[in-house]
Swiss-Prot record:
This is Manganese-binding lipoprotein MntA. Mn(2+) binds at residues 68, 130, 196, 271. A lipid is attached at residue 20 (S-diacylglycerol cysteine). It comes from Halalkalibacterium halodurans (strain ATCC BAA-125 / DSM 18197 / FERM 7344 / JCM 9153 / C-125). GO terms for molecular function: metal ion binding. InterPro entries: AdhesinB (IPR006129), Bact_metal-bind_prot9 (IPR050492), Lipoprotein_PsaA-like (IPR006128), ZnuA-like (IPR006127). Belongs to the bacterial solute-binding protein 9 family. Its main location: membrane. PANTHER family: HIGH-AFFINITY ZINC UPTAKE SYSTEM PROTEIN ZNUA-RELATED, METAL-BINDING PROTEIN HI_0362-RELATED. It is a lipid-anchor. It is found in: Cell membrane. GO terms for biological process: cell adhesion; metal ion transport.
């Protein structure tokens, strides 16, 4: 009797754990596809566009949390153990990755960024992981993912190839739209000031300078010296606006705004898509939201 009760308790704990952590964004209707896990919501959306209904997609880091220093929960380890493949951004984004995969059963880990011309960090060793903020880089992600899925699941190849082609067309249209929108901002005002200096890929692609209080969210954040430096830059450039991210403590940029006398023009999505109802639930929609926010704030 004690053995039965103990087993029941374990089952209940497992069911509770399954309800936390990894987020399921879709399911395979025919059960013949792959069980895909990825690290964060932006990649989750990209993968859903390619996998369609052929394969299920789950992401680890919940929307609203930043992926650099995420702490995996028990259900994340189980999700990765159960997966056919685990797609990650790479470039040092998932600092918790080794800890996760070392404590799960064997799973193929695939970085989606091997064809990216990665930018080196400016203040420390390593690479800037935020390559997805340049749409052309996400198009490279799509090609890597498509080819890997076709190899893993040949029976679904036609679906993956067709979905990838349609999504690449959508991304190309987004790329052209961004370039058109940017032209409305005076060149001397094309500087993005934000907490984490994550928009360097965006800046190089679309003609912006970028300034951050700190370089990466996992580094030392928001020291008085860092804030003072950014305030001086905002004043010197006579910028009309600064910005905050949805996944970062806003108090630091509030201090910059107060000390410089420059308004915070709005929130942008950097490390995650938006929650349902935000209008930024997909990668494409979040990029459109960000560009609209930059244009509105910097065109004053």
């Amino acid at each position: 009797m004690k053995k039965v009760c103990f087993s029941f308790v374990i089952m209940v704990i497992a069911l509770i754990a399954a309800g936390c952590g990894a987020e399921d964004t879709g399911t395979s209707e025919d059960g013949e596809g792959l069980k895909i896990v990825t690290s964060f919501s932006i990649l989750g959306d990209v993968l859903e566009n390619i996998a369609g209904e052929r394969s299920s997609v789950t992401y680890i880091v919940p929307i609203g949390e930043e992926p650099h220093e995420y702490e995996p929960v028990p259900s994340d380890f189980q999700a990765v153990s159960d997966a056919d493949v685990f797609y990650v951004n790479g470039l040092g984004l998932e600092e918790w990755l080794q800890r996760l995969v070392e404590n799960t059963s064997d799973v193929d880990v695939v970085e989606v960024s091997p064809t990216i011309d990665a930018l080196p960090l400016e203040e420390s060793d390593g690479l800037d992981p935020h390559a997805w903020l340049d749409v052309k880089n996400v198009m490279k992600y799509v090609e890597v993912i498509r080819d890997d899925l076709v190899e893993r699941d040949p029976d679904g190849a036609e679906i993956y190839v067709a979905n990838a082609e349609a999504y690449l067309q959508d991304l190309q249209e987004l790329e052209e739209w961004i370039h058109d929108q940017v032209t409305t901002i005076p060149e001397e005002q094309r500087t993005i000031v934000i907490s984490e200096n994550a928009y360097r890929y965006f800046g190089e692609a679309y003609g912006f300078d970028t300034v951050g209080i700190w370089e990466l969210n996992s580094h030392e954040e928001g020291t008085p010296g860092q804030i003072s430096r950014v305030v001086d830059i905002v004043k010197e450039l006579d910028l009309p606006a600064v910005f905050v991210e949805t996944t970062v403590n806003k108090s630091f940029m509030t201090t910059v705004s107060n000390d410089s006398g420059v308004d915070i023009a709005g929130e942008v999505y950097t490390d995650a898509v938006g929650l349902e109802g935000s209008g930024a639930e997909t990668y494409i929609d979040m990029m459109k939201h960000n560009v609209d926010t930059f244009v509105s704030g910097l065109s004053q």
